[in-house]
């Protein structure tokens, strides 16, 4: 089930994005990207619709999926 990012409390959204970025790793290619920059990139992807927040009822987990879904 897709959860609109606008319906998530700001602090919860911040924590969700941070956890996603840390879990995905830090290999961004030739250019080093700071944690804050990567968090901002994911937030922008959510706002633009390039990423969505997905809740799995089966596993009772929340994840961020980037395009393509």
UniProtKB/Swiss-Prot annotation:
InterPro entries membership: UPF0270, YehU-like_sf
HAMAP family per record: UPF0270 (MF_00690)
Family affiliation: Belongs to the UPF0270 family.
Protein name, as recorded: UPF0270 protein VC_2612
Organism of provenance: Vibrio cholerae serotype O1 (strain ATCC 39315 / El Tor Inaba N16961)
């Amino acid at each position: 089930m897709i959860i609109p990012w606008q319906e998530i409390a700001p602090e919860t959204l911040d924590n969700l994005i941070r956890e996603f970025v840390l879990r995905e790793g830090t290999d961004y290619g030739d250019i080093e990207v700071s944690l804050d920059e990567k968090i901002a990139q994911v937030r922008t992807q959510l706002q633009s619709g390039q990423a969505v927040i997905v809740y799995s009822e089966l596993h009772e987990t929340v994840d961020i999926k980037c395009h393509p879904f």
